Amino acid sequence: KRKQVMAELNAHSNRMVLVFNCKVKNASDFKAWSKDRAAKYVYGCKEENTISYEWHISDDGSEATLIETFVDSDSMMVRLGNHGASPIAAEVLELVDITGVLCLGNAKQDAIDALSAWGAIFHAHHAGFHKSN
């Protein structure tokens, strides 16, 4: 059994969470692409400070949400840079319309500049805790 480690309550955190809300154009095409292409491609990037990359889809397949978590703002920028240089950057826009972007955490100015082009909303870290295994 793994020992669970809990950070101090209300400790400063540099962790970033990026949430993309999307309207899916074709559910079956999107499901295949997100699982067999996008997730595999991003996994293969071996970005050591990317914590997670997870797609979620509504029951009717009409909406999807991508949630990505990172150690800090700099590692989020590595992911965004890799995304921009990848073939999946164009592919995703053939499959979904991005309807909203939410950036949670203490984003640095370069991240704010990059994500503002997508109309991102920014919320700085305020309070709480996290657990790790």
Can you describe what each PLM-predicted range is?
Residues 2-64, 71-82, 94-133:
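Short S/T/G/P-rich N-terminal loop/turn motif that feeds into the first structured element of a domain
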Residues 84-91:
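A short, acidic, amphipathic alpha-helical segment used as a generic capping/interface helix at domain edges
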